[in-house]
């Protein structure tokens, strides 16, 4: 099974591609970066175009994303919803199934603590995925955590709230 983890953002969208067989292996991870000067429609098009390249290269089976969280800024929340929608539609066109996890569940699956800090999650990810360092923006490590949550061994997944 190949899992695509996405951490959507209006300017930086993290992605991770993991392969789960008897173990979990990192195939790729990084971030889709949008120009701040671009209009919303151009940013969405860029995200979809880059996402399609990832889908064509790795042929994932499932899309894993965090559920919607509360945002203080309505404009930011609206844009995040548009990015999530673009990602969902694109992945649906490619036949991916969809799994959604709460931020607390992701932290619990990776670090064993639903209130873990980003640093604790990154530290555990390095150990779980046998990485010496996680390069790139935090959005990339968040996407790795989201993908790991779906690809993690069943005993961990069954304990999530």
Describe each PLM feature range.
Residues 1-161:
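Phosphate- and other anionic-substrate recognition elements at nucleic-acid/protein interfaces
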């Amino acid at each position: 099974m190949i899992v695509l983890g996405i951490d959507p953002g209006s300017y930086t969208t993290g992605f991770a591609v993991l392969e789960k067989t008897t173990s979990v292996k990192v195939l790729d991870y990084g971030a889709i970066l949008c120009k701040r000067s671009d209009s919303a429609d151009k940013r969405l098009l860029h995200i979809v175009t880059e996402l399609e390249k990832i889908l064509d290269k790795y042929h994932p089976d499932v899309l894993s994303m965090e559920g919607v969280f509360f945002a203080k800024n309505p404009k930011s929340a609206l844009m995040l919803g548009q990015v999530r929608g673009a990602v969902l539609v694109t992945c649906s066109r490619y036949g991916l199934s969809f799994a959604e996890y709460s931020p607390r569940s992701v932290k619990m699956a990776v670090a064993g603590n639903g209130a873990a800090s980003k640093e604790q999650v990154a530290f555990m990810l390095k150990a779980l995925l046998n990485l010496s360092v996680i390069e790139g923006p935090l959005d990339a490590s968040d996407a790795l955590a989201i993908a790991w949550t779906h690809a993690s061994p069943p005993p961990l997944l069954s304990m999530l709230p």
